[in-house]
Amino acid sequence: GDGNEGSRVRFSAPAKVGENVRSAAEEAHAGDVVMHAGEVVAPAGAGLLASAGYASGKAHATPRVGIISLGTELVAPSNVPARGQIRDSNSSALMAEALDAGAEPVFYGIAPDDEQTIAELVHRAVLECDFVITSGGASAGDYDYVTALVRREGEVLFDRISMRPGKAITFGLLGGKPYLGLSGNPAAAYVGFEMLARPAIRKMRGFAEGARPVQQATLTHGVKKRQHRRFFDRATVLRDSETGELLVTEAKTQNSALLG
């Protein structure tokens, strides 16, 4: 029929009892936990919460992470370096890492080796952000004005860590905010962020998991540990087409200035 009153419907098969009927408490019962703390509320999760009567809820705010590059020798990535200069690659990498960790990165620029300029940028970042990260000025022989500033106005909790790359790392509190001073070497800055900043940001966001997942793999050749510290080596990872096993080949050079 045309669907109007008086039309007839013909069924091709008998209906089953309960078919196409949604029972009460089919998805969750009273008292059930529909979402755990630390879970990300994705679209499906938002619908699930709404079905349980939660139109809104408490969530962790996105932390703002202030990033400052230190060094008179640094120029913006778009500039052509003059003799004795180098492009600032750390700011781009750290901003991408902060975003990936769940933060809102804020770049405060490149600070030359000038105590007043560095202090002004750091103070501004502390006022406007929840976490401040600098790269450069942390190795022996560098102008380490930031650590001196943190010692003077805040508290330095440690300024070395037993790992490589990234041994020269400063962590402390300034204005009640966490401060992390990373090495200027790109690989060292990357490892320092992954090991220390990423878990901290994830914790600030309220995520249940802080670190990246760990997978087991097999080395394609022997690797000798050179010192009594934790090493993070660059390597390539391939999956064996026959066995499905993950195979790891260490890079020929582990220079902390290299990322590739």
Predicted segments with their positions:
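Short, glycine/charged-enriched hinge/interface segments at domain edges or termini
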Residues: 1-112
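Solvent-exposed alpha-helices and their adjacent loops that cap or buttress functional pockets
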Residues: 2-4, 25-28, 41, 56-61, ...
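Structured core elements
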Residues: 10, 34-35, 66, 107, ...
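C-terminal terminal segments
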Residues: 11, 23, 86, 209-260
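Short, acidic Gly/Pro/Ser/Thr-rich loop/turn segments
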Residues: 18, 42-43, 72-76, 187, ...
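Glycine-rich, charged/polar anion/phosphate-binding loops
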Residues: 19-21, 49-56, 167, 205, ...
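Phosphate-binding chemistry for phosphorylated carbohydrates and sugar-nucleotides
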Residues: 31, 187-189, 220
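Short glycine/threonine-rich loop/turn motifs
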Residues: 85, 91-93, 100-214, 226
